[in-house]
From Swiss-Prot:
It comes from Mus musculus. The chain crosses the membrane at residues 5-25, 49-69, 85-105, 142-162, 182-202, 238-258. One of its GO terms (molecular function) is S-adenosyl-L-methionine:S-adenosyl-L-homocysteine antiporter activity. This is Mitochondrial S-adenosylmethionine carrier protein. It is a multi-pass membrane protein. Solcar repeats lie at residues 4-77, 86-168, 177-265. InterPro entries: Mit_carrier, Mitochondrial_sb/sol_carrier, Mt_carrier_dom_sf. Belongs to the mitochondrial carrier (TC 2.A.29) family. It catalyses: S-adenosyl-L-homocysteine(out) + S-adenosyl-L-methionine(in) = S-adenosyl-L-homocysteine(in) + S-adenosyl-L-methionine(out).
Length: 274
């Protein structure tokens, strides 16, 4: 990947990430409280739905930038013909690698954000310092494995589907898709991926919110899912599925549309610069 492509992916990914995280934060808070083991009302209900937003704001730019930079770089390494049947595999590998890298940034901000979302009376900085003093750096990375195990299946569905829908639309229209068309494809791909990976998201939320030293805090995803299944059944595994689908569908529209638009503009500016 050349220098203009590097810069375009870095900046466009960051801009897209900040945009979607801040716009859709209330839906994310509602989803987190629905999945909380203490229940929606005790976790705060509809009160203080912007609790934890500083953590999201700080982490969103570097997180999204790291993902898209890795995604585009891995795609550039895995050359395939435009008609190759291996294109979906390339997109899967690129997205999976991107998630592993991005989660190194995402997980600490996610841990702080989710704890703030279910205890709106506590300040984000206070929660961050409490985690550091009581659990150390390890506490900030609690749920790293469960987050990666959620994000990789999500990306294995979302990104190949997004790329395939764009290619199909471009073929039907006879030209490369516009940014808004890319956004529509992103919304559909994101909503579908969100629905099928909700049980993994529930497990990740329970692990991040669990009390230090508890069996759930160990981070075993299957054990967390089994615990939810035993206590709440299928409804528990799909708790928050509707706000999650709504947030990620709208997020896919904003995120992938903004990314395509910003990257195209940055590359165009780069070509015009002397």
């Amino acid at each position: 990947m050349d220098a203009p492509g590097f810069t375009a992916s870095l900046v466009a990914g960051g801009v897209a990430g900040v945009s979607v995280d801040l716009i859709l934060f209330p839906l994310d808070t509602i989803k987190t409280r629905l999945q909380s083991p203490q229940g929606f009302n005790k976790a705060g209900g509809f009160r203080g739905i912007y609790a934890g937003v500083p953590s999201a704001a700080v982490g969103s730019f570097p997180n999204a930038a790291a993902f898209f930079l890795t995604y585009e770089y891995v795609k550039s390494l895995l050359h395939t013909d435009s008609t190759s049947h291996f294109k979906p595999v390339k997109h899967m590998l690129a997205a999976s690698t991107g998630e592993v890298v991005a989660c190194l940034i995402r997980v600490p901000s996610e841990v702080v954000k989710q704890r703030a979302q279910v205890s709106a009376s506590s300040k984000t900085l206070q929660i961050f310092l409490t985690i550091l003093s009581e659990e150390g750096i390890q506490g900030l990375y609690r749920g790293y494995k469960s987050t990666v195990l959620r994000e990789i299946p999500f990306s294995l569905v979302q990104f190949p589907l997004w790329e395939s829908l764009k290619a199909l639309w471009a073929w039907r229209r006879g030209h490369v898709v516009d940014s808004w068309q890319s956004a529509v494809c992103g919304a559909f791909a994101g909503g579908f991926a969100a629905a099928v990976t909700t049980p993994l998201d529930v497990a990740k939320t329970r692990i991040m919110l669990a009390k230090a030293g508890s069996s759930t805090a160990v981070g075993n995803v299957l054990s967390a899912m089994h615990g939810v299944w035993r206590s709440q059944g299928l409804a528990g595994l799909f708790a928050g599925v509707l706000p999650r689908m709504a947030a990620i569908s709208m997020g896919g529209f904003i995120f992938l549309g903004a990314y395509d638009q910003a990257r195209s503009l940055l590359l165009e500016v780069g070509r015009k610069s002397p």
